[in-house]
A protein has these predicted regions:
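Single conserved hydrophobic/aromatic residue that forms the stacking wall/gate
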Residues: 1-8, 13
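Proline-centered turn/helix-capping motifs that create local helix->coil transitions or kinks
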Residues: 14-23, 119-127
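Mobile active-site "lid"/loop adjacent to the S-adenosyl-L-methionine
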Residues: 17-45
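Conserved phosphate-coordination/catalytic loops
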Residues: 36-47, 143-151
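Conserved Class I SAM-dependent methyltransferase catalytic core
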Residues: 39-95
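Flexible, glycine-/basic-rich loop-and-beta segments that form/coincide
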Residues: 97-146, 150
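Conserved S-adenosyl-L-methionine
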Residues: 152-221
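Acidic, low-complexity intrinsically disordered tails
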Residues: 222-240
Length: 240
């Protein structure tokens, strides 16, 4: 329902859920909602998500979809059914592996790249960029089990949008897309279903950008700074 206000976004970057039932390795053992579904249910979920993305993106708007390689078939099929063009698959190469239960430990994540047909897509970089992205992963994911480095999110955003344009992230998690947009002067529309990650994102944003005011809207009313601070504090107590 909330996505109707997001129509006109110039770009979408999406991370999670991957449907791999991931659990963080920190003492908090953080998890992700909707990250363990039966195959048919997950395929339906993806089609619904990508249909919403298609509806709100402008023609020519680019997307970047991080995903698990084991679910690549579902992601590609769902993107095509929604109407998107799949142009390339980029690879985020991490500086260290992620310990798991498979024979070969994962040290990369694929990221599908393409755009909504109907207009020319933006490309703001040179012709020397490659499909291999080398960015160190965070040393500790205390905020979110799969927190992305801000520099990683800023890289494709810079390539496929311009100053002041709207970047949509409908699974914002730890808020790395929001932080990246703030650093490179884009407008970020972010959505997150889990209250603890919403609160964590707000705290992270306030710590990184203390000069920026943060205000919340509740029941259609824009709260002042003090009311916002009180609500954040109350929500933090509930989560703890």
């Amino acid at each position: 329902e909330m996505t109707s206000s997001l129509v006109g976004s110039e770009m979408c970057i999406r991370d999670r859920p991957y449907n791999v039932n991931y659990e963080g390795s920190t003492e908090e053992e953080l998890t992700i909602q909707n990250d363990s579904m039966e195959n048919d249910l997950f395929a339906t979920f993806l089609r619904q998500v990508f249909s919403v993305m298609f509806a709100v993106l402008k023609p020519g708007g680019s997307y970047y979809i991080f995903h698990a390689d084991s679910e690549g078939e579902n992601f590609r099929a769902s993107l095509r059914k929604a109407g998107f063009k799949i142009a390339q698959c980029c690879i985020w190469v991490k500086n260290t592996m992620v310990m798991g239960r498979q024979d070969y430990q994962w040290q990369h994540e694929p990221c599908l790249y393409g755009w909504k047909p109907g207009a020319g897509h933006q490309w703001n970089s040179d012709r020397k960029q490659t499909t291999v992205w080398n960015f160190d992963k965070p040393q500790r994911n205390a905020i979110h089990p799969t927190m992305k480095p801000i520099a990683l999110m800023a890289y494709p955003i810079s390539n496929s949008s311009t100053l002041g344009q709207i970047v949509l992230d409908i699974f914002s998690g730890s808020g790395s897309t929001l932080m990246a947009c703030q650093q490179i002067d884009r407008i970020c529309y972010a959505m997150e279903i889990d209250p603890k990650y919403v609160t964590a994102t707000i705290h992270r944003y306030r710590a990184m950008f203390p000069e920026q005011p943060v205000r919340l809207v509740r029941n259609g009313e824009l709260l002042d700074v003090e009311q916002t601070a009180d609500m954040i504090a109350d929500q933090n107590k509930v989560i703890q």
